[in-house]
């Protein structure tokens, strides 16, 4: 019965959700400065009579109370991220970004509209269940530090009673993410580590400046940094097991002066990103890079500055909760559940999944080999993903609330 009710309600709201998503896409906002997106979400929460409050950095907490006459203290948390990226959109879609250097290139517009749809469905079905569902609309997810999710946790979003620090936590948390490497309209759920672990590093080699005709009287920062760069390329082969995914990318280099080509510069700098499947590997790579920098600089008598940090942990899916969500997916359509490819992106939902049993599921939007990945200026999204998020979140929440 729930499946058919959810499908019917989803059909009612489909055009509205697509309109919401396109409005958000045309007006992307960065970080925690997302007042237009927040106001649009609140407009529909008001329209559908869903109670909510605003919290730090323009986040929104909405709650739906089941009215079925049973004593059920269970509470499910659903979460969607709302912020865009600092990217200049180069697609040709009619609803492309209207703001230069801002783009929804990670699907957060679909996550937001999809969870709004789940809110609509659950509100319409409030007489059919007991317990509570909390919707968390989160800004600033793209901040790699993960500090915003932690701030929301510190504000009490996981507490059943946010005004009582001694209150018990919500029972379950669920989030979704679109994925281009997963075929369109397929749903993927992993057990355990389900997102990558992002880390970052910066290296500055401090040598001795001098004339390019007398390199023996200098300490050549560029040459030293080049050796460090080359050594970094061998880390994965030498230190990480081949069945454990890892990626090291140099994303920034700087040295010298374009107008002073005859001077060996005192300083040279690179920055990079580390993505690993496991937290221990990220830390190991960070430590190995530090040793490489120290040893190579020591050989040539250079000073250095090295900074490494692991930004956030992997999102971890609870086995029991993921099975319930998988069952909900199969009930909606037994042919759409698949094992997802490895996802190396990070998500600060990890700050929630480390504290309460959680499920983070992937929604396929891939059309073929020529798909542009997330964070591309030509990224495009299959809007069928919106309704899938709505239906899976709402049915999974009802199934979990119904469990003893």
Model-derived regions: residue spans:
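Acidic/His- and Gly-rich active-site-bordering loop/insert found
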Residues: 2-104, 113-130
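Divalent metal-coordination and catalytic microenvironments
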Residues: 24, 78, 108, 135, ...
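Metal-dependent amide/peptide-bond hydrolase catalytic core
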Residues: 223-404
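Non-cysteine beta-strand/loop elements that form the S-adenosyl-L-methionine
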Residues: 77-79, 201-203, 360-366
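A structural signal for isolated positions on well-ordered beta-strands in alpha/beta enzyme cores
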Residues: 53, 134-136, 305
């Amino acid at each position: 019965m729930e499946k058919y009710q959810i499908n019917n309600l989803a059909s009612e709201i489909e055009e509205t959700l697509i309109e919401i998503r396109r409005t958000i896409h045309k007006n992307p906002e960065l970080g925690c400065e997302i007042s237009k997106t927040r106001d649009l979400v609140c407009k529909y929460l008001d329209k559908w009579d869903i109670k909510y409050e605003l919290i730090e950095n323009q986040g929104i907490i909405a709650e739906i109370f089941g009215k079925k006459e049973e004593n059920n203290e269970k509470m499910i948390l659903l979460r969607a991220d709302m912020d865009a990226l600092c990217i200049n959109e180069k697609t040709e879609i009619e609803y492309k970004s209207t703001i230069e250097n801002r783009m929804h290139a990670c699907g957060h517009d679909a996550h937001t509209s999809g969870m709004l749809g789940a809110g609509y469905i659950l509100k319409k079905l409030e007489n059919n269940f007991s317990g509570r569902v909390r919707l968390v609309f989160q800004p600033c997810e793209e901040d790699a530090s993960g500090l915003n999710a932690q701030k929301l946790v510190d504000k009490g979003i996981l507490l059943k009673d946010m005004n009582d620090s001694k209150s018990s936590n919500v029972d379950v948390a669920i989030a979704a993410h679109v994925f281009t490497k997963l075929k369109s309209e397929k749903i993927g759920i992993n057990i355990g580590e389900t997102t990558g672990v992002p880390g970052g590093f910066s290296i500055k080699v401090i040598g001795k400046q001098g004339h390019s005709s007398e390199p023996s009287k200098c300490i050549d920062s560029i040459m030293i940094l080049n050796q460090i760069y080359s050594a970094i390329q061998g880390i994965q082969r030498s230190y990480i097991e081949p069945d454990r995914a890892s990626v090291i990318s140099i994303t920034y280099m700087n040295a010298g002066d374009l107008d002073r080509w005859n001077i060996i510069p005192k300083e040279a700098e690179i920055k990079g990103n580390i993505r690993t499947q496991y937290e221990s590997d990220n830390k190991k790579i960070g430590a190995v890079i530090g040793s490489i920098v120290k040893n190579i600089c020591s050989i040539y008598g250079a000073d250095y500055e090295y900074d490494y940090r692991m930004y956030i942990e992997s999102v971890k899916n609870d086995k029991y909760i993921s099975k319930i969500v998988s069952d909900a997916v199969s009930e909606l359509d037994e042919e759409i559940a698949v094992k997802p490819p490895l996802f190396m992106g990070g998500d600060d939902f990890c700050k929630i999944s480390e504290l309460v049993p959680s499920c983070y599921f992937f929604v396929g939007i891939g059309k073929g080999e020529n798909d542009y990945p997330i964070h591309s200026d030509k990224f495009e999204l299959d809007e069928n993903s919106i309704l899938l998020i709505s239906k899976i979140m709402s049915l999974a929440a009802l199934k979990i609330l119904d469990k003893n």
